Amino acid sequence: MQAYLNLCRDILNYGKKKIDRTKTGTRSIFGYQMRFNLEKGFPLLTTKKMNFKAIIHELLWFIKGDTNIRYLVQNNVNIWNEWPYQKYCNSNFFQNLTLQEFIDKIIIDEKFAKIHGDLGPIYGHQWRNFQGIDQLTDLISEIKKNPHSRRLILTAWDPTVIKDMLLPPCHVMIQCYVEKNKISMQLYQRSGDVFLGIPFNIASYSLLLIIIAQCTGLKPFEFIHTIGDAHIYNNHIEQIQKQIKRIPKKLPIMTLNPHIIDINQFTFNDFNLEKYESYGILKGVVAV
């Protein structure tokens, strides 16, 4: 994961100071690319401990086409909580619930969750129902039928419904590329929180590549991560500085249940991460 640490150093050394939408302030660079060879290990960050359980659950949530946080919080995944809670606080339904009380009610009250837990037509909706099109199914089908196509694309960016999303897609589009029996994937990400988001995204889309490879009978090769605005929030600089002083550990190994070849059939127990060693947890506040 030296590529990630190089990104961190480049932003600290060359990043421009910017005032962002959240008013937190960032150091930012524009147009950056990292490459990860999955044959050399699974690119899960080792310079801080990653919550891989959350990565799996969120990816399954996307694949299912779900956009409501109820599934996530029922599985103790809390990375999306702030956005529906913020909307709830600004609504006429607000009853002075704390964030934790709000989440507890999402878990136990299905009707409440249906009203207040939805994030709008974000990733899962766009992947599985982009103006009526199941892009994920079409992508896998096209890889099987026409592997050398230059149109092996999936996008989460639909300008007609951006205003209906609580957070417009940051990781916008993927493109797959097949060479012989190997498949690679490039992600274009318009905006990347380098401390909290980018490590998560690297692992998530690398895992998606492994899944798609298994569903198409190919071998996962390279994940290429292209970022538009790559930024470190001012309140994350100390954590980043700690990480770049650490020597990365050997990458873990990721395996799937070999009997699953239908992307709709994967469950949490079909994923197996082996030999993951990391430094300790580094916490940071998400900018909403």
From Swiss-Prot:
Primary location class: cytoplasm
Sequence positions that bind dUMP: R21, R150, R151, R190, S191, G192, D193, N201, H231, I232, Y233
Gene Ontology CC: cytosol
Pathway(s) of this molecule: Pyrimidine metabolism; dTTP biosynthesis
Name of one Pfam family that matches: Thymidylat_synt
EC main group: transferase
HAMAP family hit by this protein: Thymidy_synth_bact (MF_00008)
The protein's role, per its UniProt record: Catalyzes the reductive methylation of 2'-deoxyuridine-5'-monophosphate (dUMP) to 2'-deoxythymidine-5'-monophosphate (dTMP) while utilizing 5,10-methylenetetrahydrofolate (mTHF) as the methyl donor and reductant in the reaction, yielding dihydrofolate (DHF) as a by-product. This enzymatic reaction provides an intracellular de novo source of dTMP, an essential precursor for DNA biosynthesis.
Similarity field: Belongs to the thymidylate synthase family. Bacterial-type ThyA subfamily.
Name of the protein this chain belongs to: Thymidylate synthase
Annotated organism of origin: Phytoplasma mali (strain AT)
Native organism taxonomy: Bacteria, Bacillati, Mycoplasmatota, Mollicutes, Acholeplasmatales
UniProt gene name: thyA
